[in-house]
């Protein structure tokens, strides 16, 4: 009786013992072996109010001009010109500046001079005349054309030239048959031509560079997406294209073009900031922004999701043999698959190892397929618990290993949209929306998943 009893005890202990398999060593796959994400392009429809700077230009420019020409023989004159406020009209890439003004002119005429005591004197008393003195001043209409562009260093560049000059009220002196209109035009034009450079200098004060620099700085700041990780836009180049002017509201409209290498990481990354580069516009008519977002998820972070979301799975192999899958953890890569550590209990307990190919399904879930036993595990189970190699184990793990990426994607989208909506600096507002998000590819290294997503939407920038 005793031998039979001890034999049963040995069988029972053998059936319940822990299965021990040496964990496989994951292969090393460095990040440098991971293919680069596609470049991202952002097209920000930008609106900038120029009216405040035009008003400043008007207030800073001279309003009164005086000139004279004195000689003994012939006509001498003194003039005073005073302008009204500047009127600006926008048309595509030009600003037309209109000036209405009025002048008065004092003249004297000497038909001939002779020298007396070493000094030239008029031979007869000088004849005096005037226009716009003790009477309404004579009116003048002047216009300038300014061609506008944006320089490599984001300064508003204008090329202003005097266009139309019209004496509405000519000045003709009948007493000595002299038409002063050409003289006035010459003198007033000389003064007004000096305004060309001053108008250019004033328009260059529009704070395009400071606004662009502030936007550039803001877009380089990390965006915390709690509790999942951090988003980095990582802008690389910037350009301003398609500049056009609209008279209504006197605004400039242009497309701010950015290239970027965005990254989302479950861990904080130490990334260098990029200085504001030169203005380098791209030759494209695209208006929709497309982000190719690289998401770096460490295995530790994915394993935390697995611990949180994975429910214990019961697998019945036969009426007397069953196991409970208690925990699944990712160890790292092996060829084109990942090694999974499976902690189980039941008729047997312990840890065995599977290999599986990760993929992301159409519902944005991280799943596993082509699940199989790792070679060391298979060898061990063939000798100690062959029944565990049943296909049900692989099938149920494949069916139930599921990490929903939807929440992290929605939180990321919401955090990004929050960051791109609002006043980013005084008088500068950015707003936009993300209309589409889809998975592009999945890769993995020794320490993390690399998931590339494509996001698309529209962005707008408003500068007061």
Predicted regions and their residues:
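Generic signature of intrinsically disordered, low-complexity, basic-rich segments
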Residues: 10-11, 142
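Residue-level signal for mature regions of secreted extracellular proteins and peptides
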Residues: 9-10, 65
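Extracellular/lumenal and peripheral-membrane lipid-interaction modules
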Residues: 17-464
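C-terminal motif of bacterial Sec signal peptides marking the signal peptidase cleavage site
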Residues: 13-15
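Sec-dependent signal peptide recognition
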Residues: 2-9
């Amino acid at each position: 009786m005793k031998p039979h009893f001890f034999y049963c005890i040995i069988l029972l202990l053998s059936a319940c013992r822990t299965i021990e398999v040496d964990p496989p060593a994951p292969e090393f796959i460095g990040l440098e072996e991971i293919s680069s994400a596609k470049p991202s392009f952002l097209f920000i429809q930008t609106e900038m109010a120029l009216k405040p700077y035009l008003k400043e230009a008007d207030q800073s420019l001279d309003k009164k001009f005086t000139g004279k020409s004195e000689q003994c023989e012939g006509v001498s004159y003194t003039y005073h010109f005073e302008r009204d406020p500047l009127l600006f009209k926008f048309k595509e890439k030009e600003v037309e500046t209109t000036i209405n003004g009025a002048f008065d002119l004092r003249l004297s005429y000497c038909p001939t001079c002779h020298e007396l005591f070493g000094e030239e004197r008029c031979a007869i008393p000088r004849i005096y005349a005037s226009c716009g003195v003790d009477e309404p001043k004579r009116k003048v209409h002047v216009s300038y054309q300014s061609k506008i562009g944006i320089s490599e260093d984001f300064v508003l560049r204008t090329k202003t030239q005097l266009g139309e000059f019209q004496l509405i009220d000519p000045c003709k002196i009948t007493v000595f048959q002299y038409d002063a209109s050409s003289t006035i035009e010459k003198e007033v034009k000389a003064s007004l031509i000096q305004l060309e450079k001053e108008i250019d200098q004033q328009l260059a004060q529009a704070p395009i560079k400071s606004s662009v620099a502030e936007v550039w700085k803001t877009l380089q700041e990390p965006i915390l997406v709690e509790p999942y990780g951090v988003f980095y836009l990582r802008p690389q180049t910037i350009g301003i294209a398609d500049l056009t002017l609209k008279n209504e509201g006197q605004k400039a409209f242009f497309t701010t073009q950015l290239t970027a290498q965005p990254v989302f990481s479950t861990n904080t990354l130490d990334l260098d900031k990029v200085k504001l580069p030169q203005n380098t516009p791209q030759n494209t008519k695209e208006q929709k922004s497309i982000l190719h977002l690289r998401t770096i998820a460490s295995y530790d972070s994915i394993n935390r999701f697995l611990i949180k979301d994975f429910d214990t799975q019961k697998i019945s192999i036969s009426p007397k043999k069953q196991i409970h899958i208690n925990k699944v953890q990712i160890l790292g890569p092996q060829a084109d698959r990942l090694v999974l550590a499976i902690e189980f209990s039941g008729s047997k307990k312990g840890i065995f190892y599977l290999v599986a190919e990760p993929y992301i399904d159409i519902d944005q879930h991280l799943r596993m397929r082509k699940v199989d036993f790792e070679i060391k595990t298979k060898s061990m189970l063939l000798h100690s618990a062959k029944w565990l190699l049943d296909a049900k184990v692989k099938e149920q793990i494949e069916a139930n290993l599921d990490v929903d990426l939807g929440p992290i994607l929605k939180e990321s989208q919401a955090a990004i949209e929050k960051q791109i909506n609002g006043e980013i600096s005084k008088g500068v507002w950015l707003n936009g929306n993300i209309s589409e998000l889809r998975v592009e590819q999945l890769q993995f290294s020794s320490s993390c998943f690399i998931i590339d997503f494509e996001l698309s939407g529209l962005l707008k920038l408003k500068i007061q």
